[in-house]
């Protein structure tokens, strides 16, 4: 899958999300949605496919979509300190049962944009506590427990699909702050018109600099 195809499929997902999931056998014209469906799970699946096609040798590689990664049985706890730490990345890469990368896919920064940098700083600290630790997740189909180890070089990557909903100056401020963090990075993979725009989508462009850097990171983590 090429970069342009990824953005095109995301755009199509937005368009389909405006429609009803089911249509009646008659009187279709009376039915209309006032809000769109969420496409979060679709973008997770789509990015998983995008990455899977880049795997050179599949033996030992797993691309986990929305895995609940639990540290139950270790000293690691959640913020309240009452329960075992549980991570829910959108995507996780494992190579020979070692987790080397987490991804958080954001369609845009939306209303949470002012929390973004603080969230990234919290993630950076959290990754330092889980390096070289063991965890487990349950396979979504079989529910069989799978044991994994967190790499000493674990990374947490934010992928922002659309720059829309936030000004360029504020976006650059967030990105500059995140670039200072040891374990966290961010890639904004399109620019111009938001992919959910009701205007002409030709105004959306691939952000080649970031998308190419993202591709390089994916290749390093899956095939390095």
Predicted feature locations:
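Long, low-complexity, intrinsically disordered N-terminal extensions of eukaryotic proteins, enriched
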Residues: 1-5, 143-144, 152-161, 211-224
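Interdomain/boundary linker segments immediately adjacent to catalytic/signaling cores
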Residues: 1-75
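Charge-rich, solvent-exposed alpha-helical interaction surfaces
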Residues: 6-9, 13, 126-133, 213, ...
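Short loop/turn segments at strand-loop or loop-helix junctions that form parts
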Residues: 66-70, 103-108
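Charged, often glycine-rich, active-site loop that binds/positions anionic groups
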Residues: 68-90
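Active-site beta-strand-loop-beta-strand hairpin of nuclease catalytic cores
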Residues: 84-104
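Catalytic cores of nucleic-acid endonucleases
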Residues: 105-189
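Non-catalytic C-terminal interaction segments of nucleic acid-processing enzymes
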Residues: 163-224
